[in-house]
Amino acid sequence: MRRYILFSLLLIAFALSANAQMFTNKKALDKIADERKTLAENNRFKAVAMAKLKHWPMEESLKGKGYIRLVGVDENNHPRYYTTFNNSDAAATINTTSLWPGGSSGLKLNGSSANMKNKLGVWDGGRVLETHHELVGRITRMDSSYNNGGGSEHATHVTGTMIATGKNPLAKGMANGLQGILTYSISMGDDIAQVTEQSKNLLLSNHSYGDQCGWVFSNFYGAWVFMGKYGDSVDYNFGYYNRDAATLDDIAYNAPYYLRVSASGNYRDENGPAVGATYDYYDSNGVLQQGNRPDGISNNDGYQTIPTYNNAKNILTVGAIYPIKSGYTQPSDAVMSKFSSWGPTNDGRIKPDLVGDGVYVLSCVNYNDSSYDNYSGTSQAAPSITGALFLLQEYYSRLHSGNFMRAATLKGLGIHTANEAGGSPGPDYQFGWGILNNQLAAEAIKVSNSTKNATTSKHIIVEDLLTNAQTYSKTFTATGSGKLKATLSWTDPAGPVTVVDSKNKPIAELVNDLDLRIIKNGVTYYPWVLNPAVPAAAATKGDNVLDNVEQVVIDNVNKGDTYTIQVSNKGTLNGGTQAFSLLLTQPGDTALPLKLISFKATLVSNSVQLKWVTANELNTQSFTIQSSTDGNNWNDISNVNAKKTTGNNTYSVDNIAVQTGVNYYRLLIEDADGSITYSSVQTVQIPASKNMFTILPNPANAKATLLFNSDEKEVTVVLSDVMGRIVESKQLSLQTSNTYQIETSKLPAGNYYIKVSGSSGVVTRKLLVIHN
């Protein structure tokens, strides 16, 4: 009996562990929130008391480089300050513009879906200016913000980068249609408690701030201040996985659909005074002292300059590059900013995770309700990534009945589809995994859904659960030749925290060490690894024992090759299970691409005819006709299935309704694997007289209504039969009504002609009368 009870208890424990990773654990999150509230209150009280005694500044502006604010004390009773890390280019850099309404992808994503409201949050240094015309009516302020005046310029700028409507098109936010965002101020240091509470409902939140570390120039003291321990050459907080980092990982583990995005920091150009110059430092009692800078203190200008909790495993940390205004084409397009903080973490993990545009980014600010300004910093790079990833969740939800990706899937997808950056293939400690490519990520979602993750699909997205002593294994046969890439991502349990007295010694933070392998023709392919002892060295292949993201790339796979992807684990899994996300991109069929021989738009009578001729359609799924009145915003008007032959095929779609002025047309061509291309744009000019009126309905039974689309003041309407005999004639004033009704119930069935004459010309249309 005892064995059965034990077995039952093990089953219950197994189920609880699995549920914690796949469903939001509200009970655990409530406990974390309560603990963090108490901790923040006590720490804040202690810090305020010590500030009065030791003359620490409570807050100060850093002359265009953000601000710092006292939020507590650290493990050594030194003051702990939060500091902020001071959109068309940003959107182009990460390939998000194409996802917007009117964009080339045709996906029309802007965050406006009803189920996305209040699923995005921002924590920042003060209050967002809710009355700014880019944001008005969409901000929900969740706390009694520290800044109760006209708002914070930094918080307003960051929020605008995520959601500004685009009244100024150059400052349009990534999720510009989102109807509601939650905003918090970080003034009291209780942001982690607030995040814990909101993680039950949020999908993403942005955090463009972090602990002040290393060097900072204080206007309060009029001097450079070294924030590290006296006698240390490097601030131990750089790369340090502290208690807050562990808490953030715990939150993510219990809220598996919530992803926190954080800025990496701007410390590489905060270098302190010259050697021998006067500087301030904190002694062992936390009292500020003054001395001459010794030779050995670091300039913070290289690797391992990301502070404390921004080194957490389960968050997404973002660095800053210069904008790529015309869009990415090659790795050298990515130019590193002078300030963006680099990895690795103390235990050698890859940070930052991704990079985005953070140099001279235009967004709204709080000067007045229509003001804008350009800021630089990882603070500006992070919100563009946050807003872009939010659109991926919107798209996934559309295709999956309102359900969302797990955060590990979203993070893994962003990394998997990122554009290469840096001097060598693979990840590095400067650019992380590269530049977010939001269009390719959206394509992966579309293709994996349309193919139901078939083994022949170009893109596959899998969410699964691994148990102890189990190996996930799946075999594929390549349908084409080229590069194969697989990415494994998982939300790892919180790692161990060490309290340190000096620059901390490395300790591995990875708890559940999963392994990704690809086996082809008896050869095992390993993931990328970096060497933290030589941080500038290029990535190599090997056993990654540090990161909770692994990626295997095979540069050359031949059509017909069989390969097996395996996911396993070392040792014993914490809790007995580990949820994971697997992303795969494999080369597709090598059949010849579609050849679009011609595409023409012609005005026929009073409507447009579109005709196109193709060849090599074997891989083509369909053609969607799109129209536009401005050449930017496109609407689907008709869909035609491809004939899927190698010979020439001719297509024609007639009677396309038109509007006065220039009408634009193009073809959206979808391949079998879900990838999309576009034809050239064709235009048709419609004079005002050609579009004078429309007949609804046509054919007509009892009544036919003429709808006038003209600026004419008066027109004459003549109805005649096929013999030219006038059935009805009427002079109309369009100043009182733009419609006219013809009774057709008493007319014999057949064809009739309606002629409308006005000052701009004469238009005749055919009317068909039928009687049911």
Mark where each language-model region is:
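C-terminal tail/sorting-segment detector
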Residues: A20, A672-S689, S729, A749-N772
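Subtilisin-like serine protease catalytic core
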Residues: Q21-T24, A91-S205, G210-G222, Y253-L259, ...
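Catalytic-core environment of secreted peptidases
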Residues: W123-L135, I321-P383
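Short, compositionally biased serine/threonine- and acidic-rich segments at solvent-exposed termini, linkers
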Residues: L583-K690
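Short, surface-exposed loop/turn motifs with a glycine/proline- and acidic-biased composition
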Residues: N641-Y665, L732-S759
